Amino acid sequence: MKVAYFSNEFPHDDTRDLFRRLHVHSKDKRYPTLARFISEATSALRDEVAALPTALRALVPTFDSIFSLVDNTAVRQGRLGGAIDGVLLCALHIATFIGFYESDTEEEFDLSAVDTCLAGLGTGLLSTVALSLSPSLADLPTTGALVVGIAFRLGVVVDDVSQNLQPRPAIAESGPGDSWAYVVPDVSPEEIQKELDTIQIAEKTPEPSKIFISALSRTSVTVSGPPARLKHLFLVSAYFRDRKHVALPVYAGLCHAAHIYDEHHVEKIIQSSSLDSISAKYRPRVRVLSTSTGRPFSGLTAKELFRNVIEEILTKSIEWDEVIRGIIQRAKDSAAVECDVLIFRTSLPVHELLATFGTELQQFRASTKDLVSWIAKPDSPPAKPSGKAQSKIAIVGMACRLPGGSTDPDKFWDLLEKGLDVHRKIPADRFDVDSHYDPEGKRMNASWTPYGCFIDEPGLFDAPFFNMSPREALQTDPMQRLALVTAYEALEKAGVVPNRTAATDAHRIGTYYGQASDDYREVNTAQEISTYFITGGCRAFGPGRINYFFKFSGPSYSVDTACSSGLAAIQACTSLWAGEVETAIAGGVNVLTNCDAFAGLSNGHFLTKTPNACKTWDCDADGYCRADGVVSLVLKRLEDAEADNDNILGVILGAGTNHSADAVSITHPHAGAQAFLTSQTVRKAGVDPFDISYIEMHGTGTQAGDAQEILSVTEVFAPLTRRRTSKQPLYIGSVKANVGHGEAVSGPTALVKLLLMFQKEAIPAHVGIKNSINPGFPKDLAKRNLHIPYEQTPWPRVPGKKRIAVVNNFSAAGGNTSVVVEEASVREPVKGTDPRSSHLITVSAKSKVSLKGNLERLIAYVEANPDVSLADLAYTTTARRRHHNHRVAVAASDAAQLKKQLGSYLQSVESHKPIPSTGQPPVVFAFTGQGASHPSMNLELFHHSPYFRAQLLHLDSLAQQQGFGSFIPVVDGSHERSHAHSPTATQLALVCVEIALAKYWESLGVKPDVVIGHSLGEYAALHVAGVLSASDAISMVGRRAALLEQKCQTGSHQMLAVRASLADIQAIVHDKPYEVSCINGPRDTVLSGTREQVAVLTEVLQAAGHRCISLDVAFAFHSAQTDPILEEFEEVTKSSILFQPPNLPIISPLLGKVIFDEKTVNATYVRRATREAVNFLGAIEIAQQMSTIDETMAWIEIGPHPVCINFVKSILPRVNVAVPSIRRGEDNWQTVSHSLGLLHCAGLELNWNEFHLAFEENLRLVDLPTYAWNDKTHWIQYIGDWALTKGNTFYDAEKAAANPGALVHTRSNIKTSTVQQIIEETFSDSAATVVMQSNLMEPDFLAAAHGHRMNDCGVVTSSIHADIAYTLGAYIMKKLRPKSQNVGMDIANLEVLKGLIAQKNTDKPQFIQVSAQVHDIDLGVAHLQWHNVSSNGEVDEPFASADIVYGLPTDWLKSWVPATHLVQGRIEALERLAEAGIANRLSHNMAYLLFANNLVDYAQKYRGMQSVVMHELEAFADVTLTTEKGGVWTVPPYFIDSVAHLAGFVMNVSDANDTKQNFCVTPGWGSMRFAKPLVAGQKYRSYVKMIPTEEDPTVYLGDVYVLQDGVIIGEVGAIKFRRYPRVLLNRFFSAPDSDTSKHTSATDVSPPKKVVQSASTTTTVTKALPSKPVAIPAPQVAAPVVQPTEQVTVVKAVTELTSTVEVDSDSTASKAMALVAAEGGLELSDLPDDANFANLGVDSLMSLVIAEKFREQLGVTVNGSLFLEYPTVGDLKAWLMEYYS
């Protein structure tokens, strides 16, 4: 017997916790009925609320789940509180009941009508109806939802009636109100009623307001009535006043009142279309006992039962004793001896029931089952979501570029752990902070702050990796570029390989990035709008570019919600919950280059003015500090991440976004909206707010924002009404105090911080409070157990409990986003070990530089983690990484072996060849014949590869079904290797092993394009080609072997392998009897004969010097020994075997041809193949002639030992790659791993996932270093101050006043460290005059001068003059010939008359002016003069002059070719002299020590020479250019000096000169040319030989040659040095005073004379020019403006002035290549014939542009698909040569 009791009050547990846990369980797939009930109950309640009058409907807030109402105290204590509590009680009953049965698989829902009765009190009685009507558990959601709706209507009616008896106060007091019922113990109902009648008659109480008995039991009586009358009763009545009485928690009104309610009220409650429809389907099954009589209700339909129950609740008093009597009577009437009482926690009625069972039925055993207890039990096994909408979201990968040098999460954590505040002045690569900053806020368009937090070198980008041309990269927003880079890194960390699993289906991966500005497009690229202005600048292209590059077909969203954009993008998890995608890449981006935004935010009073990141929660917080940042995260549903074997960094439990609609202004935060959001998000996540132990707050450092946020946080997570225990501390922090406010990336940055905190188990110190805490913060934070971590605080894992945190991210536009994040579960240790003995580790890259970097990083990782599992490493680098065209694969069995092999590849990386871009090589399967393996094998593949084992066992089953014995003993190692099995077993084993191997290779993605089988192997080949089924192949092999055993004598004949050609054999053996069985190769032949005949042959051939090996076979195949079986074998084959057309070409060693048709292979063919010779040599040669095979193919030997591939290598002149499947005597896994590595490096795309699948449960993804990018800077510098002026003149007067010695600055778009201001310029069609002025005291210029110190003075080196010349030359060419391209500049005839020395007083300016004049640009010459400017603004006579001669770098390269071998010869001679101890070999440190001691002390960045070999006045040096940043240059002086100052070194250090008495300085050179750019970090070699001149022995001349990779790429020709006595050093090189006109240099040759050059001055070049001037043709090709930028990029301006120049060849193909190079921003050297245009960044847009240029300039009409039809440079050249030569 069963009794289910439903109470009229909630269990004494924490009600909110019960509902929260039920909500969490409803997401579990084990509770589908529970989830359905909550959904249907929610819908039912919504329908009821919608039907209310407007006034009542407004009292119920919107709710997403019926359970959410439990947290709404205001509603539950309001007018409809009784209705809501009734709903919640019924919902709790039914949900708990459903969950109880779903949680326990042993419990069955078996409430039968015979032995079950249902009882309940008050609202609990309604819950019994749902059970009574439900024949199964699956019906409870429907009946339960109906009960919920009726419970609500009951509550509304009760409220309506009760309000008429005693209205609620107009101003509600805190709390639920007064009680409508009191219980009086130890009295009789008769006494109570008598007293009530006496008082109410005396007071003439109106009938509806009378107090009445609503419930009675053996121990007490309950009286009910309006609260005021109840209070009056207990006040005026001595009877009641003197007795103990207790108010019950009945606050919603009256029930059990027959004098108030009638049938009308009952009908109002049960009138429902839902009830009518249910009545037709459901009928009462289980008896429900009346609480007034104890007898079952008599209703026969659902509606009748509801009517009876509602009438009972409204009009009948509760008499629990009657209910107990009814239950006891049913127990007596039944045959049961025990009773299960189902309860919702124990209670007084339950105790009374059990006590009665004990007294009245002593032989009857009654026990309780608590239906609530299951709710709090831990899940075992772990919960699985019932659907995608219920999934948790795993974060499986992250990458970042954040301020403070945080180029990865580890560096970011270092910054946080150190408590750094990484603000700094706005760097020069963004804009000139000095000119764009005004602390007083008075200047138009200026920023009020000079500070921010910035990414280092945001222009760094590996353009070729992402198939972008340099030009496209330059014009593409760095936010887009870095989003690409970090997305790749995050995906790499996550081990995401598209299409590896269902969750990584490329069609189901989407991207979601937050971005709130387009700075680079608005400022940088807007200076020069070109092809990629839209695609590179508009933010929608950022996520789209990621999808396009990775070939993801899911959605791509760019999200802009202002400051919360990034975390709003993290709500990509909503797409995961909705099932729109399986994997999401989400994040935020922000790179600040637009000074307008600084000015706008300053004027809006958003920004702090003080030098700090955000002063979060500080008393003086005055705004936020802007910040860069790029973050990418990879998200998956948790169950998918676990199934994919991912590393889980954290788990998102819930995310939500709302808006502060009620704020006082759009930008003002609103604590109420924030609190509502976080409360809702936490509740949806199923988390108790007190389980949150950390909140990463938005915390921008504004007074209003910080104060409002702490209010919302304390309200939800640390309220006064409910206190946290001492074990529930809550910490708060904000990453903005460290790295500033990244705006659109601030949310993802905070999330990365949180994930690192989980990982490091620590909370970093909060560094935002610089003085004292914000006075608006609550003063009782400590009492609330809420803490700010002023120092790093441990945050350890707690066994059995998860750390949970909240991340807040709010928007200045009013949006609020909150995310609940839980730490990942600790992964269970692997249960076993990977049985494979050898593991394949791969490394790949898209360039040699990156390959080298990746190898170095992996080696460093293995050295730092010597215990790393090689199996894990192999799994990570193969199955969990993308693979590129530069590939390295290493099969290793231990770490030492791995490091050694990786080191070997690292040494040879420069000669590494990438895989061809033409696609995968075709594959040939070559099937081995008999005799290659041991008689017995022990195949590790059979033991450890489930796939191979299953294939082999299936084939064995086919063999046994045909009557053959099992061949498994041949391969399973159950016998010694030498054990001889029957020929049938051996031959079946061979063929079946080969078939299984072929299928195994195919499972790994290696499918044959051609097959060839040797002897017995041909049967396996025919099967793989589709000619034979596996069953037929086994049948033929087995029958043939059986016939051989029956009709041929084992051992009577032999086969002899001879290392000789057939012709050689014939010439030696003459007429001795033998047969030729196999012609395997040019010198590989197999003979057959009787044992005696073979013995003679062996003796003769060995005597002739030929190696002979007797094959270990039972029969002499392909010889006369097989004649007895041929007829029968052919007949059996004809009758039983079905031959199908081949689906692959078959190379036939029998016929010596390639088989394509369906008729050739038949019974006759296999008969002949048994008897006739195998002509493997002839077959391969024919196949090659027919082009069936070629040198590109990959050969795989399918068999027990490599034989055929050795034959192939001896036949073909070149074999791409040839690998075995198994090698005799070698562990199978070692062979397979090595072969897979070779195939991988040959370009085959392998199914690595399948290779590791069987072992994956024992494998883990290793957190390896990320890809080593081959970065170069691509950056368009914002030039000038046009963002300030915007065409206005309001700054002109200010500039003139600040610089009285200069003209008003004209608006030029050029500014570098040495060319700071164009003060005058005049341009005509072909002539120009430009005058620039610079202050030597500016930091970068001064630092460059002090980098070259002589006599303790900063001396402007000639390389600085060269940089000025390059800058002005480029500027003039751009102005006069804006479309020019590929023009180099020769800085010729430099003559320095006075040294320029930095003054000591840096407080005063030290100006110089340089004038540049071009008479006719088409003559290709410009003339420059340098002048000092005195303090009064007067310009001195020129102290230096030079010419710029424009020319073609290609011509220069050609002109240097004849000298190359001479220079190389001299270098080699110096090397030999050094080895002989004659020449001096000096290290880097020694060379510069000597240089500094003798004359010049160079700064570190100038010290490029790594070693010097010197003999007398001849030397060469190996040079590496620095990567150190600093300054804006066209050609950094320290680059020029590093490759050129070898000449000065020789003159001032060589023992051929008397350096003790003399020193040497250069007055100039004849020519300086660089045909290729000087690039940071690259290596060069300089060579010079200085020779004294005949005219003056104190003057020396020489040519400095600069080589790269053995090619001369630059020259400083006719460089001159003059020798001076050392006693003059102090006189010549001393710092001047502030008036530079008084300074006289060592080379002063003329008296001071004031010279002011006007715009009309004409200078005639009379000096001999070192190279022929180039006539500049009319501009034709559009190209980007040459802009000096950061050092790494700008060097290109030296050799490439983006202009159309005649090329050296007149062919259309050559012109076309030059045009392609120009359009893509490439060098011609970047266009080898095998270069793929797609990899060079030639996309569809560029294709259209180039096609148009071809038409306009070359007269070649093509369409935009040209580069698809001719994908490589060689293809296009060939086409152009064929049709346009």
From Swiss-Prot:
Q: Which residues carry this modification: O-(pantetheine 4'-phosphoryl)serine?
A: S1740
Q: Where is this region: N-terminal hotdog fold?
A: 1316-1451
**Residues the record marks as active site:** C563, H698, H741, H1348, D1537
Q: Pathway, per UniProt?
A: Secondary metabolite biosynthesis
Stretches for region Product template (PT) domain: 1312-1631
Determine if Transmembrane helix is one of this entry's keywords.
Answer: no
The top EC class, named as a word, is transferase
Q: What is known of its domains?
A: Multidomain protein; including a starter unit:ACP transacylase (SAT) that selects the starter unit; a ketosynthase (KS) that catalyzes repeated decarboxylative condensation to elongate the polyketide backbone; a malonyl-CoA:ACP transacylase (MAT) that selects and transfers the extender unit malonyl-CoA; a product template (PT) domain that controls the immediate cyclization regioselectivity of the reactive polyketide backbone; and an acyl-carrier protein (ACP) that serves as the tether of the growing and completed polyketide via its phosphopantetheinyl arm.
**What is the name listed in the Swiss-Prot or TrEMBL entry for this protein?**
Atrochrysone carboxylic acid synthase
Q: Which organism is it from?
A: Cryptosporiopsis sp. (strain 8999)
Name of the gene? dmx-nrPKS
